[in-house]
Amino acid sequence: MSSSFTPAPDTELPRLDRKMRILLVEDHAPTRMAISRLMRQAGAEVLTARDGEEGLGYLLTQRFDVLLTDLRMPKMDGFELLQHCQTLPESHRPKRVIAISGEYEAGALSGQPVQFLAKPFNLDVLLDMLGGKPN
């Protein structure tokens, strides 16, 4: 299976404006590892989870600036994870939530304070959503 994003075509990797703590919840290991590596190169601190259940465990015990979650996963999918986020104490809710999916459309998240990114995506698009800028 191929990766669900494409690296930025530029030779210089864009950097985030500031250091961010990102929780990346993605069940597809190659995609999870590639996004994590590139987000770290862009200046983020990244923690990864294989599914919503593992991601929720991290959300209950740590604080994150951004939750970046796939929507379709085993055990607990992204939709259920987003529902749990709504019930977290304010201090443990991520400041920003970005849902990624190759199967659903943004309309599947209507009424939720969530940004949507369709797979496949370009890293530049994700960095723009996070407030990144070129070096």
What are these regions (language model features)?
Residues 1-21, 115, 122-135:
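Non-catalytic signal-transmission and effector/linker regions of two-component phosphorelay proteins
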Residues 51-54, 77-83:
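Acidic catalytic/metal-coordinating carboxylates
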Residues 26:
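Conserved acidic carboxylate
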Residues 48-66:
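Acidic, metal-coordinating helix/loop segments flanking the phosphotransfer/catalytic sites
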Residues 73:
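Receiver (REC) domain active-site loop signature in two-component systems and cognate sites
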Residues 70:
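Active-site residues of response regulator receiver
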Residues 100-101:
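Hydrophobic/aromatic residues positioned on beta-strands within the core alpha/beta folds
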Residues 29-47:
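Two-component/phosphorelay signaling modules centered on CheY-like receiver
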